[in-house]
């Protein structure tokens, strides 16, 4: 698994961040 994880840490991190922001915004819109 390390060999597959090593090449794409930046992309994965960015994706997770974008996903988190998207979910946060979605939550705000749903509760508003």
Swiss-Prot record:
GO terms for biological process: proton transmembrane transport. Its main location: mitochondrion. Signal peptide: none annotated. GO terms for cellular component: mitochondrial inner membrane; proton-transporting ATP synthase complex. It is found in: Mitochondrion; Mitochondrion inner membrane. It comes from the Eukaryota. Mitochondrial membrane ATP synthase (F(1)F(0) ATP synthase or Complex V) produces ATP from ADP in the presence of a proton gradient across the membrane which is generated by electron transport complexes of the respiratory chain. F-type ATPases consist of two structural domains, F(1) - containing the extramembraneous catalytic core and F(0) - containing the membrane proton channel, linked together by a central stalk and a peripheral stalk. During catalysis, ATP synthesis in the catalytic domain of F(1) is coupled via a rotary mechanism of the central stalk subunits to proton translocation. This is ATP synthase 28 kDa subunit, mitochondrial. It comes from Spinacia oleracea. The lineage of its organism: Eukaryota, Viridiplantae, Streptophyta, Embryophyta, Tracheophyta.
